[in-house]
């Protein structure tokens, strides 16, 4: 099946497969590429290259494909630990996920953990593929598994009753052995993904935010802060807030430059220098953010989901306990914080993923779903994401 070049005119959505080991995530990924992309064999996807995100090595396979309506980038991870790390670090951002559940086994421990993680890290929506239906002869049993999956999703605050569940066999699709549960099911799955997973809001359409990386003073012109615009647009003449570390202050952007050229605006993805009115060199520092007034607030206390590196990954060799005080690296700077473990958890071992309470010593511009690294003296020992802000 010859395919032309991907047209970038369609809306772009990032998705991934999640679910228990051996339930068929990689086979399903291969089957989708067979009908909607450049066909990748199972073993081509399974031999996933390693990449680094926030100082953590993760194996992820990336494939792309398109339906009539959208272009998709799809991530599949070979090992369970890779999923945990990927979801917490956001190495491959997911706008939605396809949960793969074997009809023969029903939901298993990693099914539960991936759904919980998806909730914690804010994967907005899930579509279910009930795989290996050819291994179940009893229609009632199939119905039971479907009910169990819906209950599990509802328990984790996903709309379990409304989520599309497509039944099929990834293997049948790959082997062309049964069109109904093979090709037809894969096409039905992608139709549901198209319809049910919303197109994400582009960074450009969100309110302006830029983490400050550096501060310069230019004689006769004032103070310039540099950084990469994370989202939104800033126009010359707009009022902005400087947030984090110190009390929030207001300023006006009197100039934007990029590659030494003056522009009338800077937008998401641009590396810019912003000239600020009425701010002296000492009034602003790396680690603060520049943002549209009233859109983001500084916070110190939050609940986080975190993954702690193993010794082999370059992490700690020993467990830690309540009152552990590492640095939390948010956007461009380290801030010391105190960790409190949940009741009943005595210690955290390298390789664990956990939910913890954190209190920073100074406030940082923070929103739910903001990601961070956990460091000790500049060495990454973990990664996390803000789940809930407390104050």
Curated annotation (Swiss-Prot):
It is found in: Cytoplasm. One of its GO terms (cellular component) is cytosol. Mg(2+) binds at residue 26. Its EC number is 3.6.5.3. Keywords: Cytoplasm, Elongation factor, GTP-binding, Hydrolase, Magnesium, Metal-binding, Nucleotide-binding, Protein biosynthesis. Its main location: cytoplasm. Residues 76-79 are annotated as: G3. InterPro entries: EF-Tu_GTP-bd (IPR041709), EF-Tu_GTPase (IPR050055), EFTu-like_2 (IPR004161), EFTU_2 (IPR033720), G_TR_CS (IPR031157), P-loop_NTPase (IPR027417), Small_GTP-bd (IPR005225), T_Tr_GTP-bd_dom (IPR000795). GTP binds at residues 19-26, 76-80, 131-134. Gene3D superfamilies: P-loop containing nucleotide triphosphate hydrolases (3.40.50.300), Translation factors (2.40.30.10). It catalyses: GTP + H2O = GDP + phosphate + H(+). CDD domains: EF_Tu (cd01884), EFTU_II (cd03697), EFTU_III (cd03707). Residues 131-134 are annotated as: G4. Residues 10-201 form the tr-type G domain. Residues 19-26 are annotated as: G1. Monomer. Belongs to the TRAFAC class translation factor GTPase superfamily. Classic translation factor GTPase family. EF-Tu/EF-1A subfamily. GTP hydrolase that promotes the GTP-dependent binding of aminoacyl-tRNA to the A-site of ribosomes during protein biosynthesis. This is Elongation factor Tu. The gene is tufA.
């Amino acid at each position: 099946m010859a395919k032309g070049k991907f047209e970038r005119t369609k809306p772009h959505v990032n998705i991934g497969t999640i679910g228990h080991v051996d339930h068929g995530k990689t086979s399903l990924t291969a089957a989708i590429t067979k009908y909607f992309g450049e066909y990748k064999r199972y073993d081509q996807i399974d031999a996933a290259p390693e990449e680094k995100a926030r100082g953590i090595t993760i194996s992820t396979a990336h494939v792309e494909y398109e339906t009539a309506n959208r272009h998709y980038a799809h991530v599949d991870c070979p090992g369970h630990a890779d999923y945990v790390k990927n979801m917490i670090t956001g190495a491959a951002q997911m706008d939605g996920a396809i949960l793969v559940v074997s009809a023969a086994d029903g939901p298993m421990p990693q099914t539960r953990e991936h759904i919980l993680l998806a909730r914690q890290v804010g994967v907005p929506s899930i579509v279910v593929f009930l795989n290996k239906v050819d291994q179940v002869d009893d229609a009632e049993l199939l119905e039971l598994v479907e009910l169990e999956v819906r209950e599990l999703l509802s328990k984790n605050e996903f709309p379990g009753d409304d989520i599309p569940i497509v039944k099929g066999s990834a293997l049948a699709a790959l082997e062309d052995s049964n069109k109904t549960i093979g090709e037809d099911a894969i096409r039905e799955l992608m139709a549901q993904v198209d319809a049910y997973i919303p197109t994400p809001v582009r960074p450009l359409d969100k309110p302006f935010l830029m983490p400050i990386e550096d501060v310069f003073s230019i004689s006769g012109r004032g103070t310039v802060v540099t950084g990469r615009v994370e989202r939104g647009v800033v126009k010359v003449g707009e009022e902005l807030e400087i947030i984090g570390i110190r009390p929030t202050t207001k300023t006006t952007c009197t100039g934007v430059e990029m590659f030494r050229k003056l522009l009338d605006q800077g937008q998401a993805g641009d590396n810019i220098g912003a000239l600020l009115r009425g701010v002296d060199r000492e009034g602003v520092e790396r680690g603060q953010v520049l943002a549209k007034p009233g859109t983001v607030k500084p916070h110190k206390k939050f609940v986080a989901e975190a993954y702690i590196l193993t010794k082999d990954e370059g992490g700690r060799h020993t467990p830690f306990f309540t009152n552990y005080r590492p640095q939390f690296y948010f956007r461009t700077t380290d801030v010391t914080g105190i960790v409190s473990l949940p009741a009943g958890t005595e210690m955290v071992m390298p390789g664990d993923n956990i939910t913890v309470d954190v209190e920073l010593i100074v406030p940082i511009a923070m929103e739910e779903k903001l990601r961070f690294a956990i460091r000790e003296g500049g060495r990454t020992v973990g990664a996390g994401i803000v789940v809930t802000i407390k104050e």
